[in-house]
Curated annotation (Swiss-Prot):
NCBIfam families per record: GGGWT_bact
Protein name: Fibrinogen C domain-containing protein 1
Transmembrane feature ranges: 4-24
Summary of subunit composition and partner proteins: Homotetramer; disulfide-linked.
Ranges in the topological domain labelled Cytoplasmic: 1-3
Length: 431
């Protein structure tokens, strides 16, 4: 009787399990392991066979016998199958809710963050536009600053030029006063020293006499440009010079030439005293030789100039000399005497009259600095110059200030000339 009741209960349980399994088979969640498959069948007149097929293809068979053999073991296996089915059913029912809850939570989070992201994107776009606008404004400001810098540099250059003119003008007044007060006796002495030479000088050279300068060479019958030996009155040993026999009637003794930058003119005192270079090219004759020439008689100066566009100009000075009023010209610095300008280049030398010669190693100018060192040349600097024909050979326009081969009245302080030639000739009595 007991076995019959248990058999009935087992059949009912098997039917319940089978129904649950069928429900799971129709409604299991995609992506999860399918639940066990349970089937029942007759195993005899009074027996039932319950089969559970698991997801891993293993089978569990339970034989229910009314004669109750191994009843405890069969019930244990049936309870195990029931537990597996209930667990699968529970997972099946819980999984959709879990997924749904996660999806809803994710959607809520996205819905909450999306406005913030959109707001931040709008802020970034606004900041980007502001940065672009600021970049454009900065570029305009930079261009304005660069333009202003260029204007200030130009104004500074112009102001330096005006200041140089002003200083030179004041210096001229002071020098004129000093000359009027104290140079009467030296001038008279120098005139007396030159008087014999001036009075004894013939218009031509007698046969066998030695030429004192290029005018004597010309008057002796030589009419070709070139190198000749001359023997000044106070320099009997003589020296060679280059004679220009063509310009304005010829007879010019050349003492300075710049033409190609092949010779370094940024030199010291000894070089400028003794001379350097090649007479047929760039050269400086030497202060002691220029002094020996110009103390013989009254000389005039002619300066030829050329720029890099083949433009030419000249400056003529009716009176020129070096160390005219000096007992010891080297000790005095070979001071310059120049006057009576005419020509097409404009005057850039009169303001240097009365000044001693300055080199990078011997400063005799009126500036706090050494003008020769500052402007890379050697000249009769005042404070500092209106001409600098012994400056650097910079080949035309340059960005530096007044340190080239300059003649400011013609090309300003930032243009280095292509050619310059300084030459002297005695003032002829028939002129």
């Amino acid at each position: 009787m007991l076995c019959t009741v248990l058999l009935a209960l087992a059949v009912l349980l098997a039917v319940a399990v089978t129904g649950a399994v069928l429900f799971l088979n129709h409604t299991h969640t995609p992506g999860t392991a399918p639940p066990p498959v349970v089937s029942t069948g007759a195993a005899g007149a009074n027996s039932a066979l319950v089969t559970v097929e698991r997801a891993d293809s293993s089978r569990l068979s339970i034989l229910i016998d009314p004669r109750c053999p191994d009843l405890a073991d069969s019930f244990a296996r049936l309870e195990s199958a029931q537990a597996s089915v209930l667990e699968a059913l529970t997972e099946h029912q819980a999984q959709p809710r879990l997924v749904g809850d996660q999806e809803q939570e994710l959607l809520d989070t996205l819905a909450d963050q999306l406005p913030r992201l959109l707001t931040r994107a709008s802020e970034l776009q606004t900041e980007c536009m502001g940065l672009r606008k600021g970049h454009g404004t900065l570029g305009q400001g930079l261009s304005a600053l660069q333009s202003e810098q260029g204007r200030l540099i130009q104004l500074l250059s112009e102001s330096q030029g005006h200041m140089a003119h002003l200083v030179n003008s004041v210096g001229d007044v002071l020098d004129a006063l000093q000359r009027d007060r104290g140079l009467g006796r030296p001038r008279a002495k120098a005139d007396l020293q030159r008087a014999p030479a001036r009075g004894a000088r013939p218009r031509g050279c007698a046969t066998g006499s030695r030429p004192r300068d290029c005018l004597d060479v010309l008057l002796s019958g030589q009419q070709d440009d070139g190198i000749y030996s001359v023997f000044p009155t106070h320099y009997p040993a003589g020296f060679q010079v280059y004679c220009d026999m063509r310009t304005d009637g010829g007879g010019w003794t050349v003492f300075q030439r710049r033409e190609d930058g092949s010779v370094n003119f940024f030199r010291g005192w000894d070089a400028y005293r003794d001379g350097f270079g090649r007479l047929t090219g760039e050269h400086w004759l030497g202060l002691k030789r220029i002094h020996a020439l110009t103390t013989q008689t009254a000389y005039e100066l002619h300066v030829d100039l050329e720029d890099f566009d083949n433009g030419t100009a000249y400056a003529r000075y009716g009176s020129f000399g070096v160390g005219l009023f000096s007992v010891d010209p080297e000790e005095d610095g070979y001071p310059l005497t120049v006057a009576d300008y005419s020509g097409t280049a404009g005057d850039s030398l009169l303001k240097h009259s009365g000044m001693r010669f300055t080199t990078k190693d011997r400063d005799s100018d009126h500036s706090e600095n050494n003008c020769a060192a500052f402007y890379r040349g050697a000249w009769w600097y005042r404070n500092c110059h209106t001409s600098n024909l012994n400056g650097q050979y910079l080949r035309g326009a340059h960005t530096s200030y007044a340190d080239g081969v300059e003649w400011s009245s013609w090309t300003g302080w930032q243009y280095s000339l292509k050619f310059s030639e300084m030459k002297i000739r005695p003032v002829r009595e028939d002129r």
